[in-house]
């Protein structure tokens, strides 16, 4: 059993001290990424398998780099193209993973709960890299890490999350993570993309983007998931940009020096204007870098030692 | 529970040992040019800082001090009862071409030093690496020998050497603890 348990499924039930341990462990990992030789022998002889039922170059590469920097061997199962039904495919995947003797499995799956199901089936540590609209804990952890690095703390900060909350697993994990660490989370977006029950998660739902942005220390802009917009949940992209897009004028409402983040990939000119995305307050590129450090911390803490099997 | 069997060094003993090691480092390297000290977490760090202080008293020159965390280089993570928490390595200078003196409190099996050597090599290519320890308690499992030793203490493998330093433990002494079978 690793220092933070067997698996990482989500932040919903993760205690604050465990989140803090992950963030603290990512600090020395970031130092390794800055070195000329970005490699330590910690996970030599361990195998990390990435299984992606949805395409995601960014997250998959980030996990693979993290594993490689720690000297683990990596195997990729590209399941993105397969459209087999959930139960069967996951069982098959579990069999394959068991046969490979994997120490950790990184799973991205379109169905909520897939990671948890796999975690119950295999001995390996399972890391949820996004399951449906449920959770994306490693992204939220890198958001927390980036904010803590920029602001020196998390407690008492005002965090505005803007956009498509309904389809966003990042938003859900962010809400759990930031509120657990003592930050105030405000949400804003088209009414059709704000599902009920958000207040129960500890967040405040605002009636306008402006209200959410007022004095915010952190602005997290979510991607409009064009691939999930077949149902016509908002009138048009141009109108979305006008009503909800984060541009320079809107950003002035936030606290001076507010950090702007985006989980990527960005739709420039729709949810975020290019001058904000590339502006001085943007931490978007650092998020990518920090993502590798946080994932190194996760792999170390979940598979680094102990007698897991 | 471990029982205290004997005290090996008191406050003055630790001070004298470090002063002697500081002199030896300067003498062997013919001064302090090109010299850097790197303490191994945790108790190697205050010892390295103290050695740097002594060297400055003697030679009037400040020697850079770095901090090395070797957790990620251990070869025994799977056999440890508790997976250790990783802390930062802070070596804010280049080690390439330098004489690096690694500093630790106790040398025992030599595995920590081996890990530290790997860690240093990943940071650059030193001209020379030397090792300074406060206590050498024997029982080496690897062909590693310290260049500077505060005190050689023959121990049995059932015993444990505990170095207590003001900066970390709030007291200054070295004791042998005997663990019950």
Curated annotation (Swiss-Prot), chain A:
The protein's name: Aspartate carbamoyltransferase catalytic subunit
Record text on subunit structure and interactions: Heterododecamer (2C3:3R2) of six catalytic PyrB chains organized as two trimers (C3), and six regulatory PyrI chains organized as three dimers (R2).
PROSITE patterns: CARBAMOYLTRANSFERASE
Molecular function in Gene Ontology: amino acid binding; aspartate carbamoyltransferase activity
Enzyme class: transferase
Gene3D superfamilies reported for this sequence: Aspartate/ornithine carbamoyltransferase
NCBIfam families tied to this protein: asp_carb_tr (TIGR00670), PRK00856.1 (NF002032)
Protein family membership: Belongs to the aspartate/ornithine carbamoyltransferase superfamily. ATCase family.
Function: Catalyzes the condensation of carbamoyl phosphate and aspartate to form carbamoyl aspartate and inorganic phosphate, the committed step in the de novo pyrimidine nucleotide biosynthesis pathway.
One Pfam short name: OTCace
Protein's pathway: Pyrimidine metabolism; UMP biosynthesis via de novo pathway; (S)-dihydroorotate from bicarbonate: step 2/3
Catalyzed chemical reaction(s): carbamoyl phosphate + L-aspartate = N-carbamoyl-L-aspartate + phosphate + H(+)
Chain sites annotated for binding L-aspartate: 86, 169, 223
Entry keywords, A to Z: Pyrimidine biosynthesis, Transferase
GO terms under cellular component: cytosol
Origin superkingdom: Bacteria
The protein's Enzyme Commission number: 2.1.3.2
InterPro entries the UniProt entry points to: Asp/Orn_carbamoyltranf_P-bd (IPR006132), Asp/Orn_carbamoylTrfase (IPR006130), Asp/Orn_carbamoylTrfase_sf (IPR036901), Asp_carbamoyltransf (IPR002082), Asp_carbamoyltransf_Asp/Orn-bd (IPR006131)
Swiss-Prot record, chain B:
UniProt EC number: 2.4.2.9
Keywords: Glycosyltransferase, RNA-binding, Transcription, Transcription regulation, Transcription termination, Transferase
UniProt keyword Amino-acid biosynthesis present: no
Keyword Phosphoprotein listed: no
EC class: transferase
CDD domains found in the cross-reference section: PRTases_typeI
InterPro entries membership: PRibTrfase_dom, PRTase-like, PyrR, PyrR_bifunctional
Placement of sequence motif PRPP-binding: 100-112
GO biological process: DNA-templated transcription termination
Catalytic activity, reaction form: UMP + diphosphate = 5-phospho-alpha-D-ribose 1-diphosphate + uracil
MF term (GO), any: uracil phosphoribosyltransferase activity
Summary of subunit composition and partner proteins: Homodimer and homohexamer; in equilibrium.
Role, per record: Regulates transcriptional attenuation of the pyrimidine nucleotide (pyr) operon by binding in a uridine-dependent manner to specific sites on pyr mRNA. This disrupts an antiterminator hairpin in the RNA and favors formation of a downstream transcription terminator, leading to a reduced expression of downstream genes.
Entry-linked NCBIfam families: PRK05205.1-1, PRK05205.1-3, PRK05205.1-4, PRK05205.1-5
Family listed: Belongs to the purine/pyrimidine phosphoribosyltransferase family. PyrR subfamily.
Protein name in UniProt: Bifunctional protein PyrR
